[in-house]
């Protein structure tokens, strides 16, 4: 499912194994992108002994030849492949890659988990947006956790939108109330894009 931390988990694995981390999205990446990554991975391994983790999001969007291209480099250790898909991998990923892989199914996050992330995003000054001096009502936090449907990114995007697009009250704070939360997760995202490039996706790093 979306928003369950697939990308972040891959980054954690790369960090804990002291590996280089490369990320591509199969919906837009072509063979040239993969060739460049393989070359860089070979150089890093040969010159510095540094392994490379290649994270391919939406790997089911690669066709058979694209998946086959990666196979020899997975086999010889040039790259460690982590693929993410919202589809059934047994139908969408080549058997040759599957036979060399372990499959982990990530479940949608529980409502309480998302609620905790929402509160952390609002109040944590180091890892969240606590420096903005915002607060969120209990019913708003519950609402976001409920309608996110297991997708933490959706809830966190709404939090960021609420903080950045809601006017401060007389007390100098931004109050994320239930109406604000409902508007942010449904319609305000369409109107707000700070740099024309999905600015509000940044808070998804919490996942």
Predicted features, each with a name:
Residues 56, 60-89, 95-99:
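Conserved catalytic/switch belt of AAA+ P-loop NTPases
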Residues 51, 129-147, 179-181, 202:
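Short conserved motifs of the RecA-like P-loop NTPase core
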Residues 1-24, 39-42, 71-72, 76:
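Walker A/P-loop
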Residues 25-27, 102-115:
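Conserved AAA+ ATPase "SRH/arginine-finger" region at the nucleotide-binding site
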Residues 21-53, 63-64:
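Short glycine-rich substrate-engagement loop in P-loop NTPases that contacts/grips substrate
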Residues 38, 100, 116-130:
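Conserved AAA+ ATPase "sensor/coupling" helix adjacent to the nucleotide-binding pocket
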Residues 142-147, 153-168, 203-207:
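C-terminal helical "lid" of AAA+/P-loop NTPase domains
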Residues 159, 165-188:
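Conserved C-terminal helix/linker of AAA+ ATPases
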